[in-house]
Amino acid sequence: MGIIVPVLTLVFLLFAKVSHGASNPRVILVGGSVGSWKVPDSPNNTLNHWAENNRFKVGDFIVWKYDMKVDSVLQVTKEDYESCNTANPLKQYNDGNTKVALDKSGPYFFISGAPGNCAKGEKITLVVLAERKSGGGSSSGDAPKVSPVSPTAQTPAPAPGPAAAHNAAVGLKVASGWFLTAVVVGLAMA
């Protein structure tokens, strides 16, 4: 009987770890692929279409891969984003492999530092979701992927899809398996 409490405690801790696994920070490549940070091929194929179809969470990292000889990434205010003003960036990155921590909820505005590229559409707005403090709802642990072009420029991000439900189901099955194992071991030791 003395071993049941430590075993059940271990099972509880493992269950807590599995159920919180979806909240781990992700490293997300801008546009979903190398070479996406460029002037878009068409007005219907912008990085904002990609961003609108993905969810970003506090703690995630966003990564740009680009040729540092011809481009850079500028984090700017909303006003500078809308006017493509490169003169006063909040932050400037020009290393060709830029990694930015999304450390607060709300919008982030990024534009190209290459002359004229922002006006041609090389810019992106990322909206980072607020952290949920209570146990309500679940979050998707899936990394964003390239999505089909959105028919309108201002569509909301989609709800988590079947993959999120699948991840939750797998986590529940793993936790249930650990719990049953602990019960069997506990009964065998009694």
UniProtKB/Swiss-Prot annotation:
The keyword Lipoprotein applies. Disulfide bonds join 84-118. Residues 168-190 form a propeptide. It holds the Pfam family Cu_bind_like. Residues 26-130 form the Phytocyanin domain. Residues 1-21 form the signal peptide. Gene3D superfamilies: Cupredoxins - blue copper proteins (2.60.40.420). Confined to flowers and siliques. Expressed in female gametophytes. Keywords: Cell membrane, Disulfide bond, Glycoprotein, GPI-anchor, Lipoprotein, Membrane, Signal. Disruption phenotype: No visible phenotype. Plants lacking ENODL11, ENODL12, ENODL13, ENODL14 and ENODL15 have a reduced seed set due to aborted ovules as a result of pollen tubes failling to rupture and release their sperm cell cargo. InterPro entries: Cupredoxin (IPR008972), ENL_dom (IPR041846), Phytocyanin-like (IPR039391), Phytocyanin_dom (IPR003245). Residues 135-164 are annotated as: Disordered. GO terms for molecular function: electron transfer activity. GO terms for cellular component: plasma membrane; side of membrane. A lipid is attached at residue 167 (GPI-anchor amidated asparagine). It is a lipid-anchor; GPI-anchor. PROSITE patterns: PHYTOCYANIN (PS51485). It is found in: Cell membrane. Glycans are attached at residue 44. Residues 151-164 have a biased composition (Low complexity). May act as a carbohydrate transporter. Required, together with ENODL11, ENODL12, ENODL13, ENODL14 and ENODL15, for male-female communication and pollen tube reception and burst at the synergid cell surface of the female gametophyte. Belongs to the early nodulin-like (ENODL) family. PANTHER family: BLUE COPPER PROTEIN, EARLY NODULIN-LIKE PROTEIN 12. This is Early nodulin-like protein 12.
